[in-house]
Amino acid sequence: MSNAGSGRRLFGAIFWSVLIVTAFPLASEAQYKGDDIPGFLGLQSGTQAPPGIYVGNVVWVYPTSTIKDNSGHAINLPGSLTSTAEIILLNVVTNYKLFGGNIGGSDGFPFIKNRIELNSLDVNTPFAYTDMFLGASLGWSLKRADIMAGYNLYIPTGRFSQGANDNTGLGQWGNEFTIGSTVYPDQKKLWNVAATFALEFHTDKSGTNINVGDMGTVQGGVGRTFYKKVSGPIPMIMNLGVAGYAQFKVTGDSGSDIPPALRGYKDRVFGLGPEFNIYIPKPRLSLLVRYEPEFGARLRTQGQTVVFSIGWVAKSLVKQPH
């Protein structure tokens, strides 16, 4: 693999590597949240990093003052809410292969303030440890495309008590399967188009007969890569483009602890906005900023997603050609 090619994969995928891997007062069509918070993936979301050990930190900020009903109309509720999360991430991509793809694994150790469990602005929790996750992935690098498949396990390590407004976790186990691809339309791979689809399933919430509906999440974007020559074999690599997401319930919430009139509804939301990220080779650092205002929400909050991240290549495991 050329140094530029290795750097491009590193730059485009380090954000996946550091990510891979979240009592409704209004008695109207309440929807429970799943574990996957949209907005954590964007440009080149379907690309796995080159073999290596990666450490990262992600900050997610979500301000909102709007809740939409099933027709898309804003529900008149007072107040506003800002949910904030910080996630420490560890990712390893190995040279071991399965079905021709590199095997990788990730851990996420998240902290959150004001965790949203239902579509309510009545949330007041301190910055505290929330539900962690473990991930596994397989990645393939083709001539004009990358492919990645994965599995994420969400573990209910946060505090949870049914009906409380100070929960830091969701009280449920989550199983998520992902498949994504990054396609390069031009021969020089300056342009990239990416999308990753995730399907999430949940156990009943602890101590309840409430099962959050199966959830689908699509994240990706369209971007342009720019290179700047610096000292050393790998250039500085910048990526600028538009990132977006769609999240929707595939099945409605169910269980005997949910009133019959509130069962079966399916929420949705979309987000779209700019992303810029840069890989600086000498300190082996990647920096990212992403802003995605939401629209088209149904039965959930509609706000603004802001993501900042930093990733560090702790050790490269790329095999050098002889």
Regions found by a protein language model. Name each.
Residues 104-105, 110-213, 262-267, 281:
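Outer-membrane pore/translocation modules
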Residues 39-41, 53-55, 59, 84-90, ...:
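Hydrophobic, lipid-facing positions within transmembrane beta-strands of outer-membrane proteins
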Residues 68, 74, 208-322:
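Outer membrane beta-barrel transmembrane domains
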Residues 45-52, 94-104, 141-148, 185-191, ...:
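Short loop/turn motifs that connect adjacent beta-strands in outer-membrane beta-barrel proteins
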Residues 24-30:
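Sec/Tat signal peptide C-region and signal peptidase I cleavage site
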Residues 55-63, 105-111, 149-155, 195-201, ...:
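Transmembrane beta-barrel strands of outer-membrane/channel proteins
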Residues 32-33, 62-85, 119-126:
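Surface-exposed strand-loop-strand hairpins of Gram-negative outer-membrane beta-barrel proteins
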